[in-house]
Amino acid sequence: MSVSGFKRIALLAPLVAVMALSGVRVFTQEDVQPVNDGPNPYRPIRNWGILPEGRQWGPVSGIDIDRDGKSVWVFDRCGNSCAGSNLDPVLKFDESGKLLKSFGAGMFAWPHSVHVDRDGNVWVVDARLTTPAELKKFPGETVKGNTVVKFSPEGKVLMTLGKSGVSGDPPAAFTDPNDVVTAPNGDIYVSESHTNLESTPNAVARISIFDKNGKFIRSFGKLGSGPGEFRTPHAMVFDSRGRLIVADRANHRIQIVDKNDGKFLGEFRDFSRVSGLVIDKDDTIFAIDSESDAKRHPGWRKGIRIGSLRDGKVKFFIPGHQTDSPDGAAGEGVARDAAGNLYTAETTVRGVTKYVKN
């Protein structure tokens, strides 16, 4: 039996037509057996990337590849957060791990994701506000966060979406944004929110679209587990057909929606509780699960699941890191360079891991 060769049972009535049109099967969570094994064609290189002397990695969740196909951009949390820090959180490394440039000191509260657009500009997401505890710990610090910032490759601020230090609704503000991605036509997509759903039952869960100049177009999505609903839309990418692929993390699925209005097109559940995504030109999907454990997703292991977006089947599995915790650890962000190497942004073991094909 293949790693995805388990019995599947489709959802009933209203989704059948959608499934037929999209060519994507839809399943309930209970129908899917854990996919925890498979060939692993990669070997890990831990602690990749050389920081200046005296600086240590913080938790990292944002990582992407430069337009050159080999340099790596990382969005580091300056320790545990960037409150009170004078460190640059936006870092660029060459393919050997040498630090080429850095910028962004004093601008962010809690760095979360980074996206490099087709012109080489660097977009970053500051995912929450500075906390009262951080303000108390660092006198003179101000409330920051809840913004999406577009930098030139040299570090010049080109655009800011949302108002730093404010929570709210687009277009004026964001509430705990997760990710940003740009469409082929330059439209900007921002997903919210990263809120703890157990303590915030009425959290927002939406994706907003802005045009290339930052003008608000529309938002779609709401909190829920049905078609077109989200529970922590943690990461987004576009596939070769221009569909928006969403890591609907707390719903334990990858959801496929129309990029214009969020119409549900399909879902896959074999990739587990996905925090980060990358898709290659052949629609091979690399999905990293940083959170599965006995409480949040029983029976599933942390790691990277690799498969086809065309059929939703997992073909390869890279297990998470061994740690003192029985559940181990895996990163939140994942990126793939032109040579096929993978890079993961590590929140638990910190820093960056590079995966090279054997």
Predicted regions and their residues:
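Bacterial N-terminal signal peptides that target proteins for export
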Residues: 1-13
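Bacterial N-terminal signal peptides
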Residues: 12-22
